[in-house]
Design a protein with these regions (language model features):
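Cleavable N-terminal export/targeting peptides
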Residues: 1-30
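Outer-membrane beta-barrel biogenesis signature
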Residues: 19-97, 364-373
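Short loop/turn motifs that connect adjacent beta-strands in outer-membrane beta-barrel proteins
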Residues: 20-33, 120-124, 138-140, 207-214, ...
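Extracellular loop and loop/strand-boundary signature of outer-membrane beta-barrel proteins
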Residues: 23, 99-103, 183-189, 229-237, ...
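Transmembrane beta-strands of outer-membrane beta-barrel pores
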Residues: 39-45, 131-137, 197, 206, ...
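Outer membrane beta-barrel transmembrane domains
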Residues: 52-71, 151-160, 164-176, 273-405
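Residues that define the transmembrane beta-barrel architecture of outer-membrane proteins
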Residues: 108-113, 193-198, 212, 238-244, ...
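Residues on the lipid-exposed face of transmembrane beta-strands in outer-membrane beta-barrel proteins
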Residues: 115-119, 129, 200-204, 218, ...
Length: 405
């Protein structure tokens, strides 16, 4: 029963948390401080682009059909029931037994808020640090559909108490009982808030001449968020990671107030050690607790190429739009027991196409003209992952307020 693939499918979701804004080449003047506050919402992660690139609801993509074959693998009592039914007459009644389809529907939603502080070390070099506060909610429901259980109840109810119990199986209840028996946490709704991975950013202007700017940005993700939990199928499990993102961005004006910013970036994940349940084989979708071991995890690196366009409507208002394409390498796991570590990285390579839009209000120029009280910037961004492979459909919205002093 592939609940892990269904519920823990948010890999990469938070890798760019608090980084929904369009890439630019702006740095702070020397000695200028800029506290800011970001608030964002990420929706759409209840859908996923599959290995074929098709967009599917996770409830449809990972529904489990409980026919006789799957029941026998799932529960030893069910196998005995099937064998017993096969002995009634000559019609293979047990092999035709079907408890229907178990749907695990999820409604995950992530909100984040992040105080960020940046300072201009020189006119070319700016550093900053951000602390994301994550709010994660997920409404989880299990439902049973398309069962032929009523026919079997009519035919065989009352013959045997144990048979009656089997015929009255509640898949939702049985699922959580099975998970608990294997040491997993029950599938319940989630509503939790925690500190995510702290990010430290450095941006340096490598070149600046005639309104043409080339910048290098390094972003370090520190593993301050929750650690990987092998017993929680509904956990995000995308925090507690160390990685470094290196980016190059170039900007220049095209015509009048229209400018462009092409960029490339490469995220390097640092290997770490986590405790994981290692499947015994391809059919072992719910590994037992005794399969847990400390493994070395090397998450796939991510390469991104993209471009943005900005148009300055007035000295105070600007709009922008952009597109980027990213590709992630497959993950890799190693350990000392020599088991099927490759199964931990199944379908972990991914690609994504994303579009963004942004509108910004700035009072900075008005402040220097003595027509604004304080220098600030307020921006609103939206982004959408409109195509991909092995990645969640992510629709993000972010509001950003920046002050300067």
């Amino acid at each position: 029963m592939n609940f892990r693939a269904l519920l823990v499918t948010f890999c990469g979701l938070m890798s760019s948390i608090c980084a929904q804004a369009l890439m630019s080449t702006s740095t702070l003047p020397e000695g200028i401080n800029s506290p800011s506050f970001r608030f964002g919402i990420i929706d759409g992660i209840g859908q996923k682009y599959t290995e074929s690139g098709s967009l599917m609801n996770l409830g449809d993509y990972k529904s489990v059909v409980f026919d006789a074959k799957n029941l026998a693998k799932f529960n030893s009592d069910a196998k005995r029931l099937i064998d017993a039914l096969n002995r009634f007459g000559g019609h293979a009644l047990g092999d035709s037994f079907n408890l229907g389809v178990l749907r695990v529907d999820t409604m995950p939603r992530v909100q984040y808020s992040a105080p960020v502080f940046a300072r201009g070390i020189t006119n070319r070099w700016t550093v900053g640090v951000g602390v994301p506060i994550i709010s994660y909610t997920n409404k989880i429901s299990l439902s049973q559909e398309f069962s032929n259980i009523e026919y079997y109840r009519q035919q065989f109810s009352g013959l045997n108490p144990e048979l009656d119990d089997a015929l009255n199986t509640d898949l939702s209840k049985a699922t959580n009982e099975t998970l608990t028996g294997k040491g997993y946490k029950a599938l319940n709704n989630r509503d939790e808030t925690f500190v995510g991975d702290i990010q430290v950013v450095s941006m340096y202007k490598l070149y600046e001449k005639n309104e043409k700017v080339l910048t290098y940005q390094a972003q370090v993700n520190l593993p301050t968020g929750p650690k990987f939990d092998p017993d929680d199928l509904a956990s995000l499990n995308v925090f507690g990671r160390t990685n470094i993102t290196n980016s190059l961005a170039y900007s220049q004006y095209l015509i009048g107030r229209l400018s462009m910013v092409p960029y490339v970036s490469y995220l390097i994940n640092i290997p770490d050690t986590v405790t994981a349940r290692v499947p015994l084989n391809e059919d072992d979708t719910l590994p037992d607790a005794n399969t847990k071991e400390d493994v070395t995890r090397t998450l796939g690196n991510i390469a991104t190429v993209g471009g943005n366009l900005f148009y300055e409507i007035t000295d105070s208002w600007m709009v922008g739009g952009g597109y980027d394409y990213s590709t992630k390498d497959a993950d890799r796991y190693t350990g000392e027991r020599g088991t099927r570590y490759d199964l931990l990285a199944t379908n972990s390579a991914s690609t994504a196409h994303r579009v963004k839009a942004e509108i910004t209000y700035s009072s900075v120029k008005s402040y220097f003209k003595k027509t604004a009280v304080i220098p600030l910037m307020v921006s609103f961004q939206v982004s959408d992952t409109f195509s991909g492979v092995n990645i969640e459909r992510q629709t993000a919205q972010e509001m950003n307020l920046m002050l300067f002093f």
